[in-house]
Regions:
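Conserved acetyl-CoA-binding loop-helix of GNAT-fold acetyltransferases
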Residues: 84, 90-103, 126-130
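Terminal substrate-recognition subdomain of acyl/acetyltransferases
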Residues: 144-149
Length: 149
């Protein structure tokens, strides 16, 4: 396996949706999940601050992470929908996608990065803790986690 990181394009939307569904099925232990609605991913391809980082192996997207820049009272970057296809898990791809996002956050001079993780997703929770993220808020079935960059 010789995978690389890249930036998703609009033509990648179907594959990203497949990975999103796979992620939801893993978290919720059911096949009864819905993917993105038509147009949900368009904002990531319009040249603004939102984009999707992907891992690619032999021309196929095997993982993705959505990156959203927020310019409210306090600027922060929100990471959303980290998904690594099953046969590529536990080899460092999720870590590299997050580290790539963290490098981007530093480049744009924003100092807070956050995301939600389902409490039932213990593997992801351990990964985020190992990367220095801390629980910012307990929100019932999930945590809001944050890291100062």
């Amino acid at each position: 396996m010789s995978w690389t990181l890249g930036k998703a394009e609009k033509k990648d939307s179907n594959r990203i949706n497949e990975l999103f569904i796979e992620m939801l099925q893993t978290i919720y232990h059911t096949d009864q999940v819905d993917g993105y609605s038509d147009g949900d991913l368009d904002r990531f391809f319009d040249g603004r601050d939102e984009w999707i980082s992907v891992a690619i192996d032999e021309g196929k997207i095997i993982a993705f992470l959505s990156i959203e820049v927020h310019h409210e009272d306090e600027e922060y970057v929100y990471l959303d929908d980290l998904s690594v296809t099953k046969q590529y898990r536990n080899i460092g791809i999720g870590t590299k996608l997050i580290q790539n996002a963290e490098a981007y956050v530093k480049d744009i001079d924003i100092h807070e990065i956050c995301f939600h993780v389902e409490k039932s997703n213990t593997a992801a929770f351990r990964l985020y803790q190992r990367l220095g993220y801390e629980i910012y808020e307990d929100q019932g079935s999930r945590y809001l986690m944050m890291k100062h960059i």
